[in-house]
Amino acid sequence: MHTLGGKKVLLGISGSIAAYKAPLLVRLLIKKGAEVKVVLTPSAMDFVTPTTLSTLSKNPVNTSFTEIKDEQDNPEWNNHVELSLWADFIIIAPATSNTISSMASARCDNLLLACYLSAKCPVFVAPSMDLDMYKHPGNQENLNKLKSFGNIILESESGDLASGLNGKGRMMEPKNIIKYLIKDLKNELPLKGKKILISAGPTYEKIDPVRFIGNFSSGKMGFSLAEAATNLGA
């Protein structure tokens, strides 16, 4: 079952080395049934190309407020409000310290920040930076400020960093972002809080101590029902 089926996701990518994980995140979102549109900051294009992301998302990638979209080289305005209203939720991954600071102070000097400020949907933020940058009081203050706005912080993970250090600051892995989204989505699902008992596999009914009546059920139907119920919040 497509656990994100029909959901519209606006993925914002800022200029971090972790941007190389963005194509995988796009693929996982689509695999789960979501429709994905991508917004790149100018610095993000130093790490990942619009061509890659448009190929995977099957949608044009937005990089600036205006883009050339016709043969006469006439610039066309990218409507950030329209993009934000289209989305069921926004994911900013990776979110650099600079982007987080801009979001916290309501700056609007690129298309991604304009989309963020126009958002009426849940916004998920996945910080990505070096260990000491992540721990800096100013950055922590900005993250707490975003939380106070109602944004959801996808906590950075610990591990090897691009600087060679080891510690907290890595962007949450794409597979874990997907798990978090699905878990959050379950709060809206129709079977949330319901307990369902499903039997699966072959059954045997004794005739006597030696013989029985049975079947060759594989249990696949029961397992599929259990998976579907789980995906609906049970």
Language-model region placement:
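A cross-family phosphate/adenosyl-ligand binding-site feature
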Residues: 1-124, 130-219, 223-234
